[in-house]
Structures are given as C-alpha cells and as structure tokens.
C-alpha cells in the first residue's frame, strides 16, 4: 500500500495506455521489497514540457519515455548520458536530487534480446527506422557490427553516418538489396503495432535471416509470423522491453530485477 514514503515512477508517451511497463516494474518492486509504484502517463506532444516540469516539481523518482517523445524530451532535461547526447534520444529519466538526467537503455536492451538468437560481433545488421529507438539500437550495435539503417526520411538515417553507420532511403529497391546482404533484420518502427501490417514483404525474407521486431503488441507480429514461416530465427519485442526495463530499473534503484519475473508479468499483461 502506498504511503508518504512511496517513490513514484512512470512512463510517458502518446499513447501510453498500451504500455506493459507498469505491470513489469511493479512486479519487480514487489519482488525486491521496494516501496515504489509505477504508472502510465498519457502525454500529448504539446504538453510534454509541462509534464516534465510537473514530474520534477512533484519529485517523481524516474520515468521511461516512449513514442513520440524520445527526442523531444531532451530539451526539458538538465543533463544527458554520453550515449543519449550523441544520438539525441532518451528513454529513461533519473531524478537525482531535483536534477533530471536523460539516459538511453534501448540499445542495450536490443543487444541483449538479439544475443538470445545470435552471437553478435562482426554481423551485418539492417535496421528499419531512424526514430528514437532505431537510432539508439543502431548506435549500440555499430560498436562491434556493420549496421545499415533505412528510413522513409533518408536524412535521418544519413545523420547516423558519423558513427560509421550506413544510412539510406527506405524503399522496395533498397530493402531488397540490403536484405540480400544482411544477417540480421530489426524493425525499429511502430508498423505492426496492434495491426496486421508489416514493413517487409514476406517474399524478401530468407531462411538464414535473424528477424527481430521491437513491437510487442501483438507478441507475434505479422513480420515475425511470416519470418517464422520462412524458417527464420525470430526475437519478439517483449525481450527488448524486458532488457531495457532491467537497465532502467538499475539506473533508478541500483538493483537488477529478474528477467523471468519481468517477462512473466509482461506476458500476463498482454493476455489481459
């Protein structure tokens, strides 16, 4: 039960009601005996600054940031981690004595999720999408892999070239060409969220490809379903959610929750 000592955490996004982060983090707080609660806050873009100011004034201990705020939130924070500053994306906010620090755990979450299916290092990775999550994933994976990012607005993808990442336009021709080259495909867009859409035509998928989708509702997106039918190894978006959540939790509390516990709680949330 909440009391005067209960710490408050949450996720801000638009929409945010679909988020599984509350059930996941609240399960971890209970398991570790931490007096805290985690809520979802639906914040439209025009109210983002007020929301962050309110969180600071109320002493909210930490936030996750999801679409469409991962880039815009930077303008309202006091400091950024090196990674967040480099890529211009934040998915985790830590309140340290009234100063709001921005961090990104998306890239690390994606890395740990992918490592469930393939050993990384020297891999050829194609990422679709150069939004907040896509940039963070590309930046992290480019440390030890060759990464190409395709985006409908090619300028956003090409802006990543200073990190040794290849950026190009997302169109059928480029998609087919780069998929012939790639060992790993990651959908870092929202295409497929609560819909039967896919960013990649099934005929472009080949058997030896590892396919990951950051979308986790539905758990088996059309992309993952068609990839499995083609014989591909797949990684669902819930694993990335779990691993980025574990790192956010560690930044807030200093504790590392159990991944099985967090995924189990998230799976229950999906089925409700």
Swiss-Prot record:
Keywords: Amino-acid biosynthesis, Aromatic amino acid biosynthesis, NADP, Oxidoreductase
Coiled-coil zones: none
Single GO molecular function: shikimate 3-dehydrogenase (NADP+) activity
Functional pathway: Metabolic intermediate biosynthesis; chorismate biosynthesis; chorismate from D-erythrose 4-phosphate and phosphoenolpyruvate: step 4/7
Reactions listed under catalytic activity: shikimate + NADP(+) = 3-dehydroshikimate + NADPH + H(+)
Binding site for shikimate: 19-21, 66, 91, 106, 216
Active site per UniProt: 70 (proton acceptor)
GO biological process: one example: chorismate biosynthetic process
Family per similarity comment: Belongs to the shikimate dehydrogenase family.
Subunit field text: Homodimer.
PANTHER family xref list: BIFUNCTIONAL 3-DEHYDROQUINATE DEHYDRATASE_SHIKIMATE DEHYDROGENASE, CHLOROPLASTIC (PTHR21089:SF1), SHIKIMATE DEHYDROGENASE (PTHR21089)
Function: Involved in the biosynthesis of the chorismate, which leads to the biosynthesis of aromatic amino acids. Catalyzes the reversible NADPH linked reduction of 3-dehydroshikimate (DHSA) to yield shikimate (SA).
Protein name stated in the entry: Shikimate dehydrogenase (NADP(+))
Organism listed in the record: Thermococcus kodakarensis (strain ATCC BAA-918 / JCM 12380 / KOD1)
